[in-house]
Amino acid sequence: MLHRRELLLTAAAAGLMGATRKPAMAGGARDAALDRYLQVLAERYLTQSPEAATSLGLDKGARVALKSRLNDRTWAAVETDRAFCREGLKGLAAFPDAGLSVQARLNRDVTAYALGLGRDAAPFDYGDNTLVSAMNEAATPYVVNQQTGDYAGTPEFLDSQHQVQSAADAEAYLSRLHEMAKALDGETDRIRRDAGKGVVPPDFILANTLGQQKDLLAIAPADARFVTALGRKAHEAGLPGDFQARARAIAEAEIYPALTRQAAALGALTSRAKPDAGVWGLPDGEAYYRWALHEATSTDLTPDEVHRMGLEQNRAIEGRMDAILKANGLTQGSVGARMAALGRDPRYVFPDTDAGRQQILDYLNGLIEAVRPKLSKAFDLKLKAPVLVKRVPVDIQNGAPQGYMNPGAIDGSRPSIYYINLKTTENWPKFTLPSLTYHETVPGHAWQGAYLTETGKLPLIRQILSGFNAYVEGWALYAEQLGDEIGMYDADWAGRLGYLQGQKFRAVRLVLDTGLHAKRWTRDQSVQWAMDNLGRARDALTSGVDRYCSWPGQACGYKVGHTEINRLRDKARATLGPRFDVRRFNDLVVEAGAVPLTVLGKVVDAWTVSGGRMSL
C-alpha cells in the first residue's frame, strides 16, 4: 500500500542493523547526551501542556506547580508551540547516527517527527493546529466545536484526571477553575481572530456547539460538574473546609460569564455560517487538508489514494459479511439493510433506560475479563493494563465520540478509563460491543498504553509524545482483528459480524473523510452514503460525520494504520518463513512505542533482517 517508502525503509533497516552489529560504538556517551537533551524537551513540553503532566501523573514533586495550571489557549501559546518545535528540531540535528544505539536513534527520530508536525502547521494560522493538539486529540480548523474546547474538555479533565488527596490538591483544583475562565476567554479571542480571516465553523457544527453551551449554562453553577466534582473529591479525601462553595463562587463570578461571552461570540457567527462541511472552503483549504491527512496518518498518501483504499476495502469486507449473513439465513436486501435488521433483533437490543445502560456497562466489564486469559495466544508480554468502564458524561454526550479511552497515569496512580456514549442504547446492538471493547481496552489502547506505564523503558519525551494517530488507532483496530484471531468470535457469528461491521465502518470513514474535505460532499450526502453502506442508526452516523468535519483526517488514521501493520506483518512472515512468530511480532509493535508509521516500518524491517531476534 505504502510502496513509495519501501526503498527508504529497507535502507533504514540496514542502517539499524549496522548499529546492532557494532555495540561497542553505541549506547555510550552520545546516547547519554541525547537522553539529557530529550529530557530538556520533555520538561519544556510539560510547561506548555500542564494538563498532560496531570494526565500522565507527572504533576508531583518538582513539577507540582503544573497541577495548578491549565493549557494556555491564547494565540500566543500557538506561537510558543511552533517556536518550541523549531528550536527542538535544531537541537536534535546535533545528534547524527554515529555513536547512537538503535533505541537512541528511534527516540530521536520519533521526537523529530513529532516536532516536524508542529513546525509544518505554521502556514495555517487559524484553528488549533499545534504539537500539543496533535498529540492530544486531533488538530482542528475550529478552535471551539462540538467536541473540542475548554467548555467540553476541562470539566471532564478535572473530574477524571485531577486527583485530590490533600488540601494543596484542592487548592490547585480551585486555581485551575480560575484558569478555566482565562482559557475560555483566550479561545473567544481566537474565535474572533479566525472569523476575521474567514474561518467560521459549518452551520450544523455551530448549532451543535451552541446547543451544548446553552445546556451547560442552564445548569445552576452549584450543580456544574466541575463544582460538584471538587466537593466529592474533597469529601472522599476527608478534607475540612467547604471547597465546593469556593468552586461555586468561581463558577458564578468567572467561568459562567466567560462561557456566556464565548457563546455570544459563536452566536454572532451564525449569520455567516454555511452548510459546507469540508475544509476546502477555508483559507488554503486544500493544502490544509493535505497537512491534516499527513498529520493523522503519518504517510504521504493523497486524498484520492485514501479514498480509493476506502472503497476497495469496503467492498472486500462487505463480501465477507454477506457470506456470514447468508450462512445464517439472512439473504434479502443489501448488507447494510440486513445489518440494520439484525440490529433491531430483540436478541441484541438493550432497553433504552437507565437499567439498559447499566446492562451495557456490565456487559463491557465481562468482555474485558473474558479476553484477558486468551491474550497469551497473541503476546509474550505480560501486562496488567487495568481499566475502568464509564459512560460519557451526560452534559457532553451530544457532541462526544461514541467510545474513547483516557490513558492511565505513568506512575500507575490512575488506570485507563474506557468511555462509552450511552445517549441512546439504540446505537449499541449487542454484537457491536465486543470489537469496540477490544479496541479501547485490551488488547487495544489500554494494552498498548500499559507498556509505557508498566515497563518504564521509554524516555519521558516518548511517553509524552505518544499520540501518533495512525499508530495508536491502527493498533487498536488491529487489536479488534486479534480478538478474532484468538477465538473471541468462534461461537458468536453475530459478534464476528459486529467485528467486520467495525472494520467496514473504518473503511467507510476513509471514503467519508476524503469525500467531505477533498471531493466536496455535503453533510447529508455523507450521512446517507454511510447509512446505505453500514446499516447503522442515523444518529450515530450523523455524529460521526460531524466529527470528521471538526477533526479532518483523524478518522483516516484507523484503517491506514491497521492496513500498514498488516502489510508489515505479511512482509515479515513471507521473509522469515517458519522463523516468524506472530506473538513476537505483536510484542515488537507494542515495544516500539507510539511511533509514526514510517518509523514503525524501519523497526519491523530491522527486526526481519535480524531473523526476528532483534529486541528494543
For the regions a language model picked out, list residue spans one by one.
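N-terminal secretory signal peptides and thylakoid transit peptides that target proteins
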Residues: 1-15
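C-terminal segment of classical bacterial N-terminal signal peptides
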Residues: 17-23
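N-terminal maturation segment of proteins
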Residues: 23-616
